[in-house]
Design a protein with these regions (language model features):
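Hydrophobic helix-and-loop "lid/oligomerization" segment in the mid-to-C-terminal part
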Residues: 1-141, 148, 152, 159-174
Length: 176
């Protein structure tokens, strides 16, 4: 009986946390879509908000990728780190990215890194998802280079969200 009551209590807490996460995600997505600098006409979608919650940026990147069928990265403020020499603290942005089948996200980030070694602090991932940290003052450079990288790997292809549906279609449902 006591274990059951505890389980119910934990389930309620988890449900509250999940509802809160969904609200944060919705707000962040709406903010990202209303940003004047969000580019959905190019081959990428990159967004950053000072109030974005680091724990939800991956989900928002996934939603943007689904909406625009473009590799998408969302950034949030990262914890400021002290430099070893005691000078001014470094300001960083943490990002989470999601991609589409035609673009290998980690390779695109590697392209950015090779073009300018001073943009990203670190990055990692695979073809469809990646995490990265960039210097905050290099955000615009990152956006430009990421667009260049994805355009390079797209090789002139236009991204189209084609849905493949595997099902039987009865002959009497077809008309000419």
């Amino acid at each position: 009986e006591e274990d059951y009551e505890k389980a119910i209590e934990y389930a309620k807490k988890l449900d509250e946390i999940n509802i809160n996460r969904k609200e944060i995600e919705k707000e962040m997505k709406e903010q990202a879509l209303s940003m004047p600098n969000i580019n959905t006409d190019g081959n990428t979608c990159v967004a950053y908000g000072e109030d974005f919650h680091e724990g939800v940026i991956g989900i928002v990147a996934s939603r943007l990728k689904e909406m625009f069928f473009r590799p998408s990265i969302v950034f949030a403020e990262a914890e400021t780190e002290d430099k070893n020499d005691g000078s001014k603290k470094e300001e960083h942005l943490k990002g989470s990215g999601r991609s589409i089948p035609d673009i290998h996200l980690r390779d695109a980030l590697d392209y950015v890194h090779k073009k300018d070694l001073n943009v990203m602090v670190k990055f990692g991932g695979h073809s469809m998802a990646a995490g990265l940290t960039i210097h905050k003052h290099k955000y615009d450079d990152f956006c430009r280079l990421f667009e260049e990288a994805v355009s390079h790997f797209a090789e002139g292809r236009k991204f189209e969200n084609i849905k493949i549906i595997d099902m039987d279609l009865p002959a009497n449902d077809i008309s000419l």
